[in-house]
């Protein structure tokens, strides 16, 4: 059987331009004629380009270079409006992304996706860092780095989506280390330090803080607790209060899943006494203000900072309550799965952090035990020598 040679020009055509360069033409996916994205110095290179396009079409890997002419701004806005990579964004996250697009990323809105190069991204990154540093220069401790990290991370994520949509061939966000969170590990809030801070706070905050510690609550989850969430020594954590552009709204928990956390008996007894001595409906706030509305995380944080700084423990934040409670649970022998259930974590990674902290704390305790034991042994030996 004779084999017919494939004519690669049957798929397209080439012609020489007055400049001497060669132009390649071939049908687009809809069958309409289109030009290659660039011209070629030789006829052979133009023919090879046509052959490559044809092969990509057959493999299903073809990318129409014209698709990348879409401006970044409209593409990014549509990506956010459609829920990002997973098709759903939390209200707070969507508001953050919209603010970043309107702020640090505004200068890229009119740029075609395919026209954004790694050099462009580096120039934008340097320029934006200077702008953000200038904007926060009068705010003590502020650097603008967190905002820059958020903006770069969003830009990289959106351009990754453009790669998957075959609008661009590769992601131009290639700055090493940019967009990564490098927050230092928070200091360990010991029960002794916690007791000291709570003791320096007004009494109205004592029980809310102990509940947050014992149930490993996020501040927003503490705000959203209702009287009916407590039953038989445990609290049901179903919701949180978040703030979007200053407006507080109630949403499901951060992971979208509810959890039941058994409180330490001493704290459970305090909650029962609190509920028995106050009135309200099951959906009333567990910890209300004088006007009947729920306490706010802002007021709690303010009271905490004032008390902590007043006794020389300003390094601790109210958000350290959750970390401290989970670390203590790990020290008490909690397994990874048990810590995940109590904290509401989806993956084991976060739970392992608390177990690691517990291991470090256990090592400190062991060293102290060894030291105390050595002192006692020497005392016994000394007494024994005296008897002799």
Task: Place the predicted regions along the sequence by residue.
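Short, basic (Lys/Arg/His-rich) helix/loop patches that form interaction surfaces
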Residues: 134-137, 196-206, 215, 261, ...
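Catalytic-site neighborhood detector that most strongly recognizes the C-terminal catalytic loop/helix
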Residues: 43, 180, 241, 336, ...
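Short, charged phosphate-coordinating catalytic segments
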Residues: 160-172, 192, 212-241, 337
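Short, Arg/Lys-rich segments that mark the N-terminal edge of DNA/RNA- and chromatin-recognition modules
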Residues: 1-39
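Flexible interdomain linker/hinge and immediately adjacent N-terminus
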Residues: 4, 115, 122-124, 130, ...
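C-terminal secondary-structure termini that scaffold catalytic or DNA-interacting sites
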Residues: 1-4, 243-260, 265-267, 277, ...
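Conserved tyrosine-mediated DNA breakage-rejoining catalytic core shared by Y-recombinases
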Residues: 18, 174-181, 187, 191-196, ...
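Basic/aromatic-enriched alpha-helical hairpins
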Residues: 52-62, 73-141, 158-160
